[in-house]
């Protein structure tokens, strides 16, 4: 056992606040970090301690400064770091730096982050686990000719994907040979900018697909469970905007097979801590295919928490300290005892202008009135009257999660809740 007594969250806004809450309930002292541009952000005031990182004028780089964050953690007696999502959450160098400093990284081990960070290596892992994968290139393409050859073998349409990325960036759908050159150059450029690597690979594109993902949780002793599935098919620009749990109108046999496939991948990888295995389900054939594993907490983890009653972040902190899933504090020793009750739905209130191609908006919120009521959960960042929304970070303002006995009831809760919101000063 390696107890965590003081936890630094290497992140900002709503996910930092979310982690602080679970840590506080476990009696763990919390530490926030904030960039100069985030000096008025709410998350810094929700922790027991808060420290400035980086330099003025470098807001993103401040949260990516591995050496600076680890040095700060050591200087202030931190013995655990939770990376949240985004930023350094999937960076094996960060996890390695934490380990070298004697700090527990709340997430998978370094080798696993390295494997899962390479989408082609992750495809190989799924194949070894006996899980179906989409037809595609076994490794990144080396140029236009290589991409064209593979695309012709697969048949149009195909999709180009960043080999070392995610979040919808570095992805392009190509419906014919005349589109390939421009799409390849664009995907490689975006991938290089976002992930530091221009490597992309080619997959067959499923035109009518559902995006289904399974929540996993593993301990350091080889035990692994799933917490059922989520449907994340409602997307914009390959990025999720609405998530549901459980997936509605999914054939029970398909649901069971997908959850079993996720467990098979997790066991093959010897997965530990929280992670999500993502699949595409062909709406025409009912067949499903592995996409990737996200080795971190997900934005949409709240819908799973609502239908299972399980605090996933709390379990992350416990298993990182060495607790077994079967320990009373964790309470997940028996897969059959984990139940899904009711339905949950999440949507995101963002500071984007719907009349201007959803471009991010920023400025001072002159008014903010949130909503609540039966079946509603709000996970907010810097959301209050007078708050300043800066142009430097993600536009997410509040995650709204609704729970009901059915999806229809949850949808009714969330519609009423969104109508109650009043936000002025920035477009939403």
Name each region found by the language model.
Residues 33-35, 52-99:
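N-terminal glycine-rich "phosphate-gripper" loop used for MgATP/nucleotide binding
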Residues 3, 65-68, 146:
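Well-ordered alpha-helical segments embedded in enzymatic catalytic cores
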Residues 99, 103-163, 170:
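A conserved helix-loop-beta module that forms one wall/lid of the active-site cleft
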Residues 2-36, 50-52, 74-76, 92, ...:
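ATP-dependent carboxylate activation and anion-phosphoryl transfer catalytic cores
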Residues 38-42, 58-60, 88, 111-115, ...:
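Short gly/pro/ser/thr-enriched loop/turn and capping motifs at secondary-structure boundaries
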Residues 49, 80, 158:
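Short, Asp-centered acidic motifs that coordinate Mg2+ and/or phosphate
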Residues 33-49, 90-91, 119-122:
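Short, glycine/polar-rich helix-capping loops at beta-to-alpha or helix-loop-helix junctions
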